[in-house]
UniProtKB/Swiss-Prot annotation:
It comes from the Viruses. This is Minor tail protein Gp6. The gene is 6. InterPro entries: LtfC/p132/Gp6_b-sand (IPR055688). It comes from Mycobacterium phage L5. Pfam families: LtfC (PF23926).
Amino acid sequence: MADLGNPLDLEMLCLVTGRDFRWTIDYPWGPGELFLELETGGEHNALHQVYVTGATGGTYTLNVNGTNTPAIDYNDVSENPQGLAGDIQDALDAAVGAGNAVVHPVSLFPAWTLNFNLNASKPLTEQLVNTINKAANDFFDTFDQLLGVDVEMTVTDTLNFKLKVTSRRSFDEVGVVTFAVDVTSQAVINFFNSVAELTGAVNTVNVDFYWNRTYDIEFTGSLGLQPIPATTADITNLAGTSKAVSVTVVEPGKKRLTIWPFTVNGETATIKVESEEADKIPNRCRWQLVHMPTGEAAGGDAKQLGRVYRQPR
């Protein structure tokens, strides 16, 4: 029996490391698109980490893949029996559709902002800054529940500075109920006065307490295995003098296939790929030259195929 279909010879696509790739070919295939499809692999879901800090209440929204979520209540966990993560999940489902984004469990970190005013007789010096940082760590180390803290110091002038203190230990929503760390202005002043180098240095301390929180959004379903633009936040309606929502792209997301389109002009088709993109293609990567006729949504016709040969400079 004769073979069915037209076998294609295995051919070479030559890329020179550090150089642009450009080529022109004849185009006899009629209306449609022409592109190189490279099987680069490394496909993975996009993963964005959201970090809410310095807030005391109110609501915020996320812009996810170009669509705004409904308002997310900073504190209210009554709308979904799964708690805070469930409320965030509901908001994401409303924006991108159920099954297309998954919220990983929310972690809560107790945090404090301490605004210090020093007495004029004890202005800040380099030595005093080091002593203050050590004293702050020692003070919060007295609370066994925290398991250590991170301290960030911001100096306004020689008599005023701010300490941002964040627990290294995270808590879930059940753990919050049993959290028993009570940091008061007077307790801070008393502790600092007990340090010989700081006796009489502190005039006033204002203490603000927050439950900072972080959670991951993994894009799945129809948004899986592809790049997703960075999520952004609108915090206009969030309460708190130090409120902020930051988003880190932990994994950008990637498709299995890399597509390089040709530009068709009459009976010829040309392609140019900048060296930065061409250098991402590994040696011996499989490729196909594909013609996608107008009106066809997927599939297309393979015209050539082969492997990449990466030629060193």
